[in-house]
């Protein structure tokens, strides 16, 4: 990493269960980010076509009844609106990155065969798919929707911003998964999430300090009123996802955000000097590690 680069977290609400319309919205937002001079845009966890909230997914656990039947209809719609990789929607995302000459990182529901995966796709400014990572372990209700990820993408990619890598939501709480990125030299750490709690920010501050990297946490923002009317939502607040996106420095301080309860774009300038100074005292996979005693093996 060298110099100063501008990045963006795009806390936007998808057009729920409408893949094409959501990508249309993404395209407009990426154009705005590019016009502001940012070199990377990060979107929330499974932005395309929507994050599967427990407000309806809980009903998938039932064997019968009207709610279970309605939830299965919604699951079928989610499957039909998911992204295939490679495929036309992935190609369109790649073209959006190329047309705007930036790095585009977006969370998608990815369909592979008969299984949906929670995936992070990172496209390069030349329109290539540079990183394809599937969430290793779905959390709680998500196990009714997504399959288990694999070891692909547990690494960084070289970019003009520095080495970029990422983990999805609560996989960021898995120490070995984090260390996989540390030993790959991560400098810009992507953390798309659906966790809109205050506790999440304690984790992000810790990860920034532990990794000595810049951390971009982009969180789901979703209103109950934005769902199609036939989605069986359990009673609850209007905000299904309250956001809380933020960009953090290697010392755990905020460079931008948190942004709560609304759509918006966060920008921050990442200065490589901050990263280098932070690593004088601590480097988790370098001078403050003991590879002679402790070693991570990725299968």
Go through each PLM region and give its residues.
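Cys-nucleophile CN-hydrolase/nitrilase-fold catalytic domain and related Cys-dependent amidase chemistry
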Residues: 19, 31-125, 195-197, 201-213, ...
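Extreme N-terminal starter segment of soluble prokaryotic enzymes
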Residues: 2-9
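C-terminal beta-strand edge segments of enzyme domains
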Residues: 220-299
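Active-site catalytic loop in hydrolytic enzyme cores
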Residues: 84-85, 89-91, 95, 110-187, ...
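N-terminal phosphate-binding loop and adjacent alpha-helix
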Residues: 11-28
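Short beta-strand scaffold segments in enzyme catalytic cores
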Residues: 106-108, 119-122, 155, 245-247, ...
């Amino acid at each position: 990493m060298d110099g100063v680069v501008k990045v963006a977290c795009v806390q936007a609400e998808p057009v729920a269960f409408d893949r094409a319309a959501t990508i249309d919205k993404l395209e407009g937002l990426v154009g705005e980010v590019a016009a502001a001079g940012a070199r990377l845009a990060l979107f929330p966890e499974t932005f395309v076509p929507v994050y599967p909230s427990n407000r309806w997914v809980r009903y998938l656990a039932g064997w019968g009844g009207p709610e279970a039947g309605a939830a299965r209809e919604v699951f079928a719609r989610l499957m039909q609106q998911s992204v295939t990789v490679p495929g036309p929607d992935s190609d369109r995302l790649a073209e959006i990155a190329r047309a705007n000459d930036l790095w585009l990182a977006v969370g998608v529901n990815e369909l592979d065969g008969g299984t949906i995966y929670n995936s992070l796709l990172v496209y390069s400014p030349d329109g290539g798919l540079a990183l394809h990572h599937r969430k290793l372990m779905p959390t709680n209700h998500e196990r009714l929707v997504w399959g288990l990820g694999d070891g692909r993408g547990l690494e960084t990619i070289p970019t003009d911003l520095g080495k970029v890598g990422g983990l999805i939501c609560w996989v960021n709480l898995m120490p070995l998964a984090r260390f996989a990125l540390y030993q790959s030299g991560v400098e810009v750490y992507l953390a798309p999430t659906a966790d809109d709690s205050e506790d999440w920010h304690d984790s992000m501050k810790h990860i920034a300090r532990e990794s000595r990297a810049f951390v971009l946490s982009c969180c789901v923002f979703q209103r109950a009123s934005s769902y199609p009317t036939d989605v069986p939502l359990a009673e609850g607040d209007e905000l299904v996802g309250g956001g809380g996106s933020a960009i953090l420095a290697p010392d755990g301080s905020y460079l931008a955000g948190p942004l709560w309860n609304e759509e918006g774009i966060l920008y921050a300038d990442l200065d490589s000097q901050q990263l280098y100074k932070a690593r004088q005292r601590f480097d988790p996979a370098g001078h403050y590690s003991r590879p002679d005693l402790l070693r991570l093996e990725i299968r």
